[in-house]
From Swiss-Prot:
Subunit structure: Interacts with SPIN1, SPIN2A, SPIN2B, SPIN3 and SPIN4. Interacts with TCF7L2 in a SPIN1-dependent manner. Interacts with PARP1; promoting PARP1 ADP-ribosyltransferase activity.
PANTHER family: SIMILAR TO RIKEN CDNA 2700081O15 (PTHR34589), SPINDLIN INTERACTOR AND REPRESSOR OF CHROMATIN-BINDING PROTEIN (PTHR34589:SF1)
Transmembrane found in the keyword field: no
Cross-link (Glycyl lysine isopeptide (Lys-Gly) (interchain with G-Cter in SUMO2)): 48, 189, 220, 290, 294, 374
Induction of expression: In response to DNA damage; expression is regulated by KLF4.
Name listed for the protein in its UniProt record: Spindlin interactor and repressor of chromatin-binding protein
Function: Chromatin protein that stabilizes SPIN1 and enhances its association with histone H3 trimethylated at both 'Lys-4' and 'Lys-9' (H3K4me3K9me3). Positively regulates poly-ADP-ribosylation in response to DNA damage; acts by facilitating PARP1 ADP-ribosyltransferase activity.
GO biological process, one term: DNA damage response
Residue ranges, compositional bias (Basic and acidic residues): 218-228, 287-299
A GO CC term assigned to this protein in UniProt: site of DNA damage
Lineage: Eukaryota, Metazoa, Chordata, Craniata, Vertebrata
Keywords on record: Chromosome, DNA damage, Isopeptide bond, Nucleus, Phosphoprotein, Repressor, Transcription, Transcription regulation, Ubl conjugation
Location in the cell: Nucleus; Chromosome
Residue numbers carrying Phosphoserine: 121, 148, 248, 251, 308, 310
């Protein structure tokens, strides 16, 4: 303080001497302002020196942590218990396990791994502690929602999830597109419900791409047309087709005529091995008086029976691919596959497979193609 007083006195003497020499007051003021930053710099340096001193910070931190004597060293060195319930002491900075947790072992760990964390301010340490506590709380909330005990988290987490997923997924229908080769059609065959038997895919007559109808009119056919029915069953390849008749879908025809529903969103272009599967997780939505004729129809004399056009499908599928919901009287979700080996022979050449009987129900869907321009007359059920 004495030095600062002397410096201020000397500055004043210099100003008064220059004023006696007859200089203007403005020049004297300028001369007086020039040496003033020196004592201000000295003051700022003296003000900056107290923060690096460890004594006031340690005293303040000790004073704040005195009420929490039980976990004071854990908060000071950022050590927390494992959120998995094992009781291990973990470092909140690096996550390493601290053997024989104590203040000395925690300090030695910090000095070896990350000594810079000893200089963290109390606010930074509080932020780390808060984030750690939030993470532990989130883990506890997740475990509280799961019925399994915390000791066997990894073992029993997979069991309640499959039980809950089917309940949540029963309402909507799913459309899955598989871009696999035709050498792997066994997955739909294995997932096929027990009551279904393999069917050959229907023969769809060739139609021009320009005959597509608007989306709203696709399901409302004029009275002079009969939609072609598509039999559902597992996808077929040349190796799995039991039907030896020549006009079957395994004929070496390179041309591809997709149904109108499929052409609606692909324009007839399919990659190699394209498979479209429609899964319906719902049970029958109602008594299904409109669907029971389709489910009760049987194939006789090698020709399947025709039926009247089906009513409009649910609006959900109409907005996606214009595919009708296929309902099966079974508890397991059915699967429908559409392969690229449709042929161009007319509908009348469709026959039941070699190993099929004529008394099991077939589940059919509708398309907007016609058969020789004349509708078939459906037989009563």
């Amino acid at each position: 303080m004495a030095l600062k007083a002397e410096g201020a006195a000397l500055d004043c003497f210099e100003v008064t001497l220059k004023c006696e020499e007859g200089e203007d007051e403005e020049e004297a003021m300028v001369v007086a302002v020039i040496p003033r930053p020196e004592p201000m710099l000295r003051v700022t340096q003296q003000e900056k020196t107290p923060p690096p001193r460890p004594s006031p910070l340690e005293a303040g931190s000790d004073g704040c942590e005195e009420p929490k004597q039980q976990v004071s060293w854990e908060q000071e060195f950022l050590v927390g218990s494992s959120p998995g319930g094992s009781g291990r002491a973990l470092c909140m900075v690096c996550g390493a396990e601290i053997r024989a947790p104590s203040a000395d072992t925690a300090r030695s760990h910090i000095l070896e791994q990350h000594p810079h964390t000893l200089d963290l301010s109390p606010s930074e340490k509080s932020n780390i502690l808060e984030a750690w506590s939030e993470g532990v709380a989130l883990l506890q909330d997740v475990r509280a929602e799961q019925p399994s005990p915390p000791n066997s988290d990894s073992g029993q987490d997979a069991h309640p999830d499959p039980d809950a997923n089917p309940d949540a997924a029963r309402m909507p229908a799913e459309i899955v597109v598989l871009l696999d080769s035709e050498d792997n059609p066994s997955l739909p065959k294995r997932s096929r419900p027990r009551g279904l038997r393999p069917l050959e895919l229907p023969a769809v007559p060739a139609t021009e791409p320009g005959n597509k109808k608007p989306r709203g009119q696709r399901w409302k056919e004029p009275p002079g047309e009969e939609p072609v029915r598509k039999k559902r069953g597992r996808p077929m390849t040349k190796n799995l087709d039991p039907d030896p008749e020549p006009p079957s879908p395994d004929s070496p025809t390179e041309t591809f005529a997709a149904p109108a529903e499929v052409r609606h969103f692909t324009d007839g272009s399919f990659p190699a091995g394209f498979v479209l599967q429609l899964f319906s997780h719902t049970q029958l939505r109602g008594p299904d008086s409109k669907d029971s004729p389709k489910d009760r129809e049987v194939a006789e004399g090698g020709l399947p029976r025709a039926e009247s056009p089906s009513p409009a499908p649910p609006p959900g599928l109409r907005g996606t691919l214009d595919l009708q919901v296929i309902r099966v009287r079974m508890e397991e979700p059915p699967a429908v596959s559409l392969l690229q080996d449709w042929s161009r022979h007319p509908q009348g050449t469709k026959r039941v497979g070699a190993g099929d009987t004529s008394d099991w129900p077939t589940v059919l869907s509708e398309s907007s193609t016609t058969v020789a321009g004349k509708p078939e007359k459906g037989n009563g059920v």
